[in-house]
């Protein structure tokens, strides 16, 4: 019998029960066999020990096994998804990395070819299409074309000839008719100046006689 059964110390050294994370919650709310079997896997013997009745145990066991089969079927579907999704995602990441490496390698290769050929590629946003100048047009040292200079010179000559052909505007004296008066004032006087007696006599003759006013004081 000693070979079949172990003592308490040896049994505790082999079989140990560790407290669960929700041990404090189990102390507050005492569980039953149904909740424990739903949360964990239990056997028929554990259910019979809990119910202590074969009929109740069989009834519980039939419903419990059916529920376990349904959950296992749903879990198998999700298991396929969990297995294939990481594989597809990892394959997509690998292809993306390979594509980026290939693009970088191709860009460096084209850049090296352009440098060896002596052509420096310009950025695309700086490319400006400019029409080439006509072959017969030659620019002088000032940067202006002869056609433009001829146009400027011809225009200035036409303006100067137009201004030379025009008569100057009349003066103020000519416009107001005071030219003869000004000329007569500037010409030298031929007659001698009048005498003093003539000036006095002419002033006295032109004077108006004044009538004396007599005022009487009362």
Swiss-Prot record:
What are the entry keywords? Answer: Disulfide bond, Membrane, Transmembrane, Transmembrane helix
**Mainly localized where?**
membrane
Cellular compartment(s): Membrane
- One of the record's GO cellular component terms: extracellular space
Q: How is it modified after translation?
A: Gla residues are produced after subsequent post-translational modifications of glutamate by a vitamin K-dependent gamma-carboxylase.
Q: Which residues of the precursor form the propeptide?
A: 1-20
Q: Does the keyword S-adenosyl-L-methionine apply?
A: no
**Residue spans, topological domain Cytoplasmic:** 102-218
PROSITE patterns of this UniProt entry? GLA_1 (PS00011), GLA_2 (PS50998)
Q: What is this protein called?
A: Transmembrane gamma-carboxyglutamic acid protein 1
This protein's gene is called: PRRG1
């Amino acid at each position: 019998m000693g070979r079949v059964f172990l003592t308490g110390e040896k049994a505790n050294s082999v079989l140990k029960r560790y407290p669960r994370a929700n041990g404090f919650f189990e102390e507050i709310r005492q569980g039953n066999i149904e909740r424990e079997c739903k949360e964990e896997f239990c056997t028929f013997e554990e259910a019979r020990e809990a119910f202590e009745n074969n009929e109740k145990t069989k009834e519980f066991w039939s419903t419990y096994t059916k529920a376990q089969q349904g959950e296992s079927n749903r879990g198998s579907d999700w298991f396929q998804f969990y297995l294939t999704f990481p594989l597809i995602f990892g394959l997509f990441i690998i292809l993306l990395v390979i594509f980026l490496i290939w693009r970088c390698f191709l860009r460096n290769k084209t850049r090296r070819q352009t440098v060896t050929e002596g052509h420096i590629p310009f950025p695309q946003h700086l490319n400006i299409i400019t029409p080439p100048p006509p072959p017969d047009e030659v620019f002088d040292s000032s940067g202006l074309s002869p056609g433009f200079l001829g146009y400027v010179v011809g225009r200035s000559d036409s303006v100067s000839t137009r201004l030379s052909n025009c008569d100057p505007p009349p003066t103020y004296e000519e416009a107001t008719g005071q030219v003869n008066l000004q000329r007569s004032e500037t010409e030298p006087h031929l007659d001698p100046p009048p005498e003093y007696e003539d000036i006095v006599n002419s002033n006295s003759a032109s004077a108006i006689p004044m009538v004396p006013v007599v005022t009487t004081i009362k």
